[in-house]
Amino acid sequence: MADQLSEEQISEFKEAFSLFDKDGDGTITTKELGTVMRSLGQNPTEAELQDMINEVDADGNGTIDFPEFLTMMARKMRDTDSEEEIKEAFKVFDKDGNGYISAAELRHVMTNLGEKLTDNEVDEMIREADIDGDGQINYEEFVKMMLSK
């Protein structure tokens, strides 16, 4: 399944993996998964975190290594994000709930994820998704961006 991913996708997933793998040991633990989920405004229980790990933990060692992570991401991409997941993700970014993601909101979430972006990088991300050119991302633009990945 992971062999259907492009090199670019694999390198993006490697970057995402290292955001989760806080101590850089090559595996994601329930603790690390919890940290990232909480930084995204989610509040999973220990049991939910364990379930998430168990779903992709092919060798049953209780952690996720990069090949397992790739399999999970490939599976997720195949099940293309449901409308509900996209709505939830939009809410995470749209901090003030006004229906738009501003550059400041985007920067805030990315910083919480451990991604230190320059103003130019944030502006570039907004520009790429901002179809109507108003300088922010509305829900329709967000959906298009999520489905075009």
Swiss-Prot record:
Trimethylation of Lys-116 observed in other calmodulins is absent here. GO terms for molecular function: calcium ion binding. Keywords: Acetylation, Calcium, Metal-binding, Repeat. InterPro entries: CALM/Myosin/TropC-like, EF-hand-dom_pair, EF_Hand_1_Ca_BS, EF_hand_dom. It comes from the Eukaryota. It holds the Pfam family EF-hand_7. Ca(2+) 2 binds at D57, D59, N61, T63, E68. Ca(2+) 4 binds at D130, D132, D134, Q136, E141. The keyword Transmembrane does not apply. Ca(2+) 1 binds at D21, D23, D25, T27, E32. Ca(2+) 3 binds at D94, D96, N98, Y100, E105. SUPFAM superfamilies: EF-hand. The modification N-acetylalanine is found at A2. GO terms for cellular component: myosin II complex. Residues 8-43, 44-79, 81-116, 117-149 form the EF-hand domain. Calmodulin mediates the control of a large number of enzymes, ion channels and other proteins by Ca(2+). Among the enzymes to be stimulated by the calmodulin-Ca(2+) complex are a number of protein kinases and phosphatases. This protein has four functional calcium-binding sites. Belongs to the calmodulin family. This is Calmodulin. The gene is CMD1.
